[in-house]
Amino acid sequence: MSQFKRNASSKKLDSETKYKLETLSELFPDWTNDDLIDLVREYDDLETIVDKITTGAVTKWDEVKKPSKKEKPASHIEHQSHSSHQQLQQQAASHLDPEDSPSLINQHHSHQRQSRSTSKFSNNSANGKSVQQRQQHQSNNKDNKKQPSKDSLKPAPLPSKSNAGNNAGSWAAVLAEKKKAHEKKIDHTKSSNTIAHESTNEQSESNEHTEPTEVEVAPAQPVDSAPESVSHQHAPESESIATTNGDSKPKSWADIASAKSRQRQLQQQNKKQQQQQKSKPLDNFDALKEEVDQLSSEQTENGNHAISQEPEQQQQPYAQQSTFEEPAQQEEEVVAETTEQQQSQQPQQEEPAQPEVSQVQETAPVSLPEETNAANGVSNIQFGSEDKAAQQTLASQNYYQQQPNQQYAPQQVPQSAAAAAAAQAQAQQYYMYQNQFGYSYPGMFDNQSYLGYGQQFGAPQVPQGQVQPGQQAQPGQQPAAGSPNAQQGQTASAYGAPSGTGYQSQEVPQQSPAQQHVQPQQYSGYGMPYMYYQQSFPYGQPQYGMAGQYPYQMPKAGYNYYPPQPQSQQQGGQAQGSTQSQVEEEQANGQQGGANANAANASQQYQQYYQYQQAQTQPQQQAQQGMPYGYSSYDYSSQTSRGFY
């Protein structure tokens, strides 16, 4: 075999491999070329190799203690059997290597010898190299002697082997080992005692190197999971080693995980069959499927039980709702169950024990919506038919207010609370909507001098949620047009739908942005709406003292909101064209507008500057006159309103 490997290696050194080898030998000068060739064959990716060498997951071939004669063939064959697993996996990829075929023949012997080679590993474990490293390394090299082709070294996506490798901590991996061990145990009880003792030592040692895996699994798995977590390639074979150790003496298993014994027995049988039928990996799929179904259905039953109990207790108050909710709930559980089964069958053989976990996880999120629905009485998270249920529940709760459209109105809160909430919401919206087009903003009419004020808001306003003294209507009800209170109905629907339309007034959200607020001067008494403050942004921040933030913002005639600031730096761009003398000329020319007069108390420089600007902008102002274009401000000379809309 090894000779074969050498030839192959000399034949097959293509440029890529050479490049990798050079890089690696630069990085790790103490590694020999042969070892590196093995690694390059094993792992395609350069990064992976470097990673493995630095973490010590792979060690140099020559460091492993030379196996004695008896063990040498054993380890060869062990790796052959490994390759046979891989070969089976390869059927998926259909890249079969002719060299591998002997492994099928040798497969029967593999287990026998494996147990011996394992004892060798555990004896060696005293020399300070971790068992895993040695074992990993041996496996690397043996594999490569055996299997030069890159393809055959990649784990293929076939049943239990490769997947067990990928979930380093999965029960499936442990069970797979269990199964193999079981066979070996039957074959050779003779070697079992010595190995059992060694295996316990070895386990304790390799525990130090394991990545954290599931708690119950840990003792059996260590040997297997560390190499796996470092390399998926070796999963199967390291598994088999772990197996021999952990398993040749069943008692230790029983001690470690007696709780799972029933499952494990089932598992053993299945896996044993699977082992025998290796060449036809999917034969015993049905048996497995049954088992999975059984597990998952047990689980769903429990899950459903838990789910359906709680809503039922809480749902008694809402009879209707519960009847509607039940179908949805069952539907969901069915979905959960089926998806669960599909999931557990996909990784076909691997995960027979996984259903427990995944099932719990799956039912949990399903149950949440139900519980919240039941608790709130109104479903926040609605599936399919449940919103019907919610609507009807509302209808039944509001049965005492038999208005035709009542069913659509949001649930009524006690009136005082509703009024407060509405007031708050509208206060918020008042500020929100100030600067949006297409509304008439109540802020505009706050100072009663505004012409349209009396017409728009002449009618006394009653906050939405409250009822006028004479009116015995439910909060959501529109008074009939003829009634003495019709006036309120009409003003209320000034922004909402007109009262004839069969909409509940409440369905139009807070109709006017701030209907309740229109009592004069309610807002901390600025007599002027934001609309007339100058805006430097198109969005709706109220512009109080923003001059500092926006370089081109200038005070206008009659506004002292902005402290005068020396504008020369801010306005640098426009100033560049003019010299000081020009500015003074202009001043002498008597061009002081009203704006200048107002700015007179500011510094001399400021005045000159401002005036220069006026001179710049006059032509533009004339062009703009009469265009409703700097919408947010009536002062068309303002720098800021130009160009935004």
From Swiss-Prot:
Residues 60-81, 140-153, 176-190, 280-292 have a biased composition (Basic and acidic residues). InterPro entries: CUE, DEF1_CUE. The keyword Oxidoreductase does not apply. The keyword DNA repair applies. Residues 118-139, 191-204, 294-307, 373-383, 634-645 have a biased composition (Polar residues). GO terms for cellular component: chromosome, telomeric region; cytoplasm; nucleus. Belongs to the DEF1 family. This is RNA polymerase II degradation factor 1. It comes from Kluyveromyces lactis (strain ATCC 8585 / CBS 2359 / DSM 70799 / NBRC 1267 / NRRL Y-1140 / WM37).
